[in-house]
């Protein structure tokens, strides 16, 4: 289990839980060390503001200071074997990261695949064997039903799909130049067979069971409070105004900008990938 529940001594920790990295890795060899300096950079936090200081994304700001670990989503070290040296904590995500030492002397961080251990060998290439942590195109000998993550949407672009903690996608079919995948959201879509993907499931399978327990835990993550529109003034929200505790005064709920809040599709119309989506994600 990668989730550890709090004891309910103070009210703030009642029903709260945290991510326990050591239990998630299920290994006594997890390294608690400083990250590699060459693989770390400062992280500019925009706090939900644009270049003029105007809020463009609400409920963001604050949070604990942290350094960003540069993750190798491209896995473009073709046919160069690497060894897992450490499994480290990453404050920027709910899963761990693995420091990989390659045969040419380079070091890179990758996402922690569930079940991998320190000392294991990984490789990326067209002829990479079917093993946890290896990366290869979807067109090679990946069997139907295989679990993959860190999937490219276009060849050479780097992994963009299925990168969250505990997620995985399954290969359903191969036809022509396309491969059909079932994503964690329930969406079924096709991708070019030349796209690379990493074999296995991302660590921390119990990430969806995480409960922060108190408002302060959200503030540590850089998430500010979400205020209901019905308690605002009319100038701030369509639901605002009225004497005392009153209904919203509308037939349907609206966003702060006056658009329908429930049931309206937010996906961009006539997107290039619409033809590749065979079934939309489950709401």
UniProtKB/Swiss-Prot annotation:
A GO CC term assigned to this protein in UniProt: mitochondrial large ribosomal subunit
Compartment annotation: Plastid
Record InterPro entries: NA-bd_OB-fold, Rib_uL2_dom2, Ribosomal_uL2, Ribosomal_uL2_bac/org-type, Ribosomal_uL2_C, Ribosomal_uL2_CS, Ribosomal_uL2_dom3, Ribosomal_uL2_RNA-bd_dom
Signal peptide: none
GO terms for biological process, alphabetical: mitochondrial translation
Keywords: Plastid, Ribonucleoprotein, Ribosomal protein
Keyword Plastid found: yes
Ranges where the record places region Disordered: 229-274
Superkingdom of origin: Eukaryota
Gene Ontology MF annotations: RNA binding; structural constituent of ribosome; transferase activity
Protein's UniProt keywords contain Ribosomal protein: yes
Primary localization class, coarse: plastid
Biased composition (Basic residues): 262-271
Subunit-level organization: Part of the 50S ribosomal subunit.
Family: Belongs to the universal ribosomal protein uL2 family.
UniProt name for this protein: Large ribosomal subunit protein uL2c
């Amino acid at each position: 289990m990668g989730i550890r529940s709090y004891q309910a001594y103070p009210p703030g920790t009642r029903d709260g839980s945290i991510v326990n990295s050591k239990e998630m890795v299920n290994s006594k060899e997890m390294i608690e060390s400083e990250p590699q300096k060459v693989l770390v950079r400062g992280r500019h936090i925009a706090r939900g503001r644009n270049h003029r200081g105007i809020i463009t994304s609400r409920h963001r700001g604050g949070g604990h200071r942290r350094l960003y670990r540069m993750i190798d989503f491209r896995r473009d070290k073709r046919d160069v074997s690497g060894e897992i040296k450490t499994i480290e904590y990453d404050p920027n995500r709910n899963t761990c990261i693995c420091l990989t030492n390659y045969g040419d002397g380079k070091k890179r961080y990758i996402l922690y695949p569930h079940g991998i251990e320190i000392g294991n060998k990984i490789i990326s290439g067209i002829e990479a064997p079917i093993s946890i942590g290896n990366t290869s195109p979807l067109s090679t000998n990946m069997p139907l039903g295989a679990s993959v993550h860190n999937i490219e949407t276009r060849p050479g672009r780097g992994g963009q799909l299925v990168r969250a903690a505990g997620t995985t996608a399954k290969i359903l079919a191969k036809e022509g130049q396309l491969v059909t995948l079932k994503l964690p959201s329930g969406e079924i879509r096709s991708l070019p067979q030349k796209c690379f993907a990493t074999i296995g499931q991302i660590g921390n399978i119990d990430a969806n069971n995480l409960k922060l327990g108190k408002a302060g835990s959200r503030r540590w993550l850089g998430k500010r409070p979400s205020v209901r529109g019905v308690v605002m003034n009319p100038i701030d929200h369509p639901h605002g105004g009225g004497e005392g505790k009153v209904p919203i005064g509308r037939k349907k709920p609206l966003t702060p900008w006056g658009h329908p809040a429930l049931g309206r599709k937010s996906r961009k119309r006539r997107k290039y990938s619409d033809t590749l989506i065979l079934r939309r994600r489950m709401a």
